Amino acid sequence: MRGGFEGMLDDLDELRVPAGYKPEIIGGNIVLSPWPKGFYTRVMRRVCGQLEPYLPGGHLLDRTPHLFVFPGAERAFGPDIHAAHAQTYETDSVHLDGEGLSFVAELTSVSTRSGDLTDKVEVYGKAGVPVYLVLDMQQEQAIVFGSPSPRGYETRFTKPFGEKLYIPDPFGCTLDTTGFQAPQG
């Protein structure tokens, strides 16, 4: 491995990733996270369908895998759902500017839950990402973080799946989490 954050990004680009995993840089390490379970697609589609009408002007909402880079924090994340100004995506680089994000959502897995609820909360909040939504699939609850500041997020609201959760500005809408649970059986 080469030195520093830029070296880690280069190493990540050259990494041969096993099928079923995606690489991220978390806590100064290259971490392989599993691809989502099949039913996560249903949940992601419901989130996108509800938020799309409330997107800030000129922004795009997507589930395409992209690596958003936060050089100051030496982190690079590949969120499950992301929204950013269209200009953020207008690059030939695979490393997108994390500070261009207006919304991020992560659906936790057993292996990613801790980082989704700690490291990513801190990095997204300090970077100024207006809204970070964590769908805690293990605890069947939705957690939304808002009001980013240099200290991190100032607000946090939690609702169990099946209830409605307010998504703060720049969206200013309500997310219905009915049907976010895993299929039975």
Regions found by a protein language model. Give the residues of each.
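Gly/Pro/Ser/Thr-rich low-complexity, intrinsically disordered segments predominantly at protein N-termini
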Residues: 1-185
